[in-house]
Amino acid sequence: MKNLIKGRYQGILVTGTDTGIGKTHVATMLAKTFLATGITHVGVFKPIETGVTGVPADALKLKESAECCEEVNIVAPYTFKEPVAPWIAAKKENRPISFDVIEKTYNYIGEKHDVIIVETAGGLFVPISEQGNYADLAKRLNLPILVVVGLRLGAINHALLTIQAARSLGLEVLGYVLNEFETDDSPGAITVEEALREFSGVPFLGKIAHNEFSIEKGREILDKVLDLTAA
């Protein structure tokens, strides 16, 4: 097992300010970038994916971007049909989610890979089960947090709440990535970057333009994360 992130983490938890704001987009870009830097064993993990009627789309994108050998049902061990929070989806299908199963799967992936990119379903405090939420899971798996901020009106509050709550629980926040997931040039969206630089207290890792997907942008983000090893 290698700890490539700050010398003490094998994985990164990619979470966000909301659902549908580009977490998978950022996670797949990072996976591709790790490969481009010569790290050939990149693991990906989305413990729970909801809104699945066939193959879990996000898990498949993650698997393909990392060129990993795990089957999709390992990348996403829990899938549910309804596009709702994991805890609710699991209750509706009477299939409880176990943190033990998630941890065992994470460790299995970790034995075969140098780094693991883990993606949440929704935000950091979305309930997974009676055992807790993604913040609890991050603590259990010893994962630092990368926050994807969807650039739109209201994102300042969502981002600051996520960052400050994570830090109050003792989680390390590596920084945040701004993602223009919509073509929104409203004053509210434009001021998000300025406000977060002033008040977030964590590093700004990069800004992704609408529909942008490039190794260059991924490297810009990843270099800042890996540069933290000297901190």
Regions found by a protein language model. Give the residues of each.
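Short internal beta-strands
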Residues: 46, 146-149, 174-180
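C-terminal lobe/tail of nucleotide-utilizing enzymes
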Residues: 2-6, 164-231
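Inter-motif core of Ras-like GTPase G domains
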Residues: 129-152
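N-terminal phosphate/diphosphate-binding loop that engages ATP/GTP or pyrophosphate donors
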Residues: 4-5, 9, 25-96, 100, ...
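Phosphate-binding/switch loop-helix module in NTP-utilizing enzymes
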Residues: 86-128, 135
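Conserved glycine(s) of the Walker
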Residues: 21-22
